[in-house]
Amino acid sequence: MRRGLIARSPVELPDAVFDARLDRVRAAMRDAKLDALVIYTNNTRTAGVSWLVGFVPYWSEALLVVPRDGAPYLVAALTFRVKTWIERVSRIGEVLHNPRVGLKAAQQIASLQKNAAVGIVDFDGLPAGIADDMREGGPGLALSDAEPLFAALRAKADPADIALAGKAAAIAYQALSQARGARLNGMIANAEQQARLDGAEEIYLAAAPDLARDSRFMRIEGEVALGNSFALRATVAYKGTWVRLVRTYCDADIARKAAARFAQAVAQLPSDSGFAGFTSWLVEGCRMAQPLDPLIGSRLGEGYPPLPGALVSVQAALAIDGQTVLLGAPALIGRSGEASSLIADPLYD
């Protein structure tokens, strides 16, 4: 199903967007004296490759190779029969097929320069078998971790990122707005149907069915009884951009008070000072390949504070008049001297 929902939009992501991103990557590669950059992708680690070429795998795995000079190419474990689909939904110079993607990628790089300097994004997160295959396929290649290089490039959202996050947030908001009814499963079904109709590539819905008992989100299987107040969380992907929104079903006055405190806290990010008095909070965003990496939060320790201009999704829990309220929405981190801002309304009718 997901494959059928993935499509390239030359209006929302024109070639110039990918060209500008690749130009920035290649400039950083020249500074770091790298001959090639390699990014791993699978159906859970989509954000690095989709950001550069628009490819989003619906299953299996692949390596994107970005030469310092030349068009990027994809080495995919998917069979040759999906070659035309990959070419249709992404902007890639060539698609190579091999079940051992690391071996083929290294052989291809080494065929042009046997001692090439190759940076691997999130080297520590690369599956060991693929890393071993790369060493076998290119024994003379100098492999290094390119995490700092790529994370610095991904830290700041460009205008296309912001536009797509706004569209994804609108889809998630409308989905949660349609989550109505007396039974939780029916509410979830209504929300998912709305998101699919609005073009979501993916939507994951989780629930906290009774906030008086437990504020943790869970995947719902079977029918679950609802408490007097409960919450739904929608995680939505659109054109490779992921956001999270949270809706708490509670007294309207309590919801308004909670939303105001949440917006005030978000405005002070990346400082955590606004979340004083909150039960818990979490800021997620894309650093490399995971679309929603935990960055900072009440339970994370030092973490990775988002830089000015970063797109993030924020979740928080707080008590208003003794009642637990969960909130969540995407936000844009302000630049120097600017406040950060939500890009979706945390209040629902």
What are these regions (language model features)?
Residues 1-349:
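Active-site neighborhoods and metal-handling regions in enzymes and metal-associated proteins
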